[in-house]
Amino acid sequence: MVMKRITLDELRQLAKAANGKINKIYLHWTAGNYHQFFGDYHLNIDNDGAIITTTDDLAEHKSHTWRRNSRAIGICMCCCADAVAYADGGVDFGSVPPTAMQIDSMAKVVAVLCEELGLDITADVVMTHAEAADLDDYGPATTCERWDLWKLPDKPGDGLLKPGGDVIRGKAIWWHNNW
């Protein structure tokens, strides 16, 4: 397994090579620590926003999202050890919360991938694990088994917790329009 740091330009080249082979992007966190990378995801994003790839082929099958791995790229933020979701909808990101640099980097990664793969930055194409899990009855709306990126702070916006997919997709659209 490859495990190396890459730039957005290098990611752009990997995405060009995978064009026509990918139609979904799933966003995760590891529920682990900063600097702890996992081969289940194509891309890991560290606390400083660094992008770590685990493959030279983004079309490689990886086991990141239950029953949703074919023709899909899995991206994770290395964070959220000890995170807890509460019944009232509150969240505690644990001892290793997502950083603003991770969130922004994930948005840039999504923008690059969607541009090079010819994908729209919509909730049908770019989905958090929480959003996918809700569709398959194991997310925050049901068992809360998987709630990755269910909510994220909207920074530099108002700083309030908002649906994580909306935060990342919104930033990705901004990056796509403002390179």
Could you describe each region identified by the protein language model?
Residues 1-69, 177:
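N-terminal catalytic cores of peptidoglycan-degrading enzymes
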Residues 24, 72-74, 125-127:
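Structural preference for beta-strand elements that scaffold enzyme active sites
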Residues 38, 70, 101, 105:
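Short, well-structured alpha-helical interface segments that form or flank functional binding sites
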Residues 67-86:
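Short coil-to-beta-strand
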Residues 1-19, 86-179:
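Basic/polar, cationic surfaces and motifs that engage anionic cell-wall
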Residues 32, 80-82, 131-135:
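Acidic glycine-/aspartate-rich tracts in secreted/extracellular proteins
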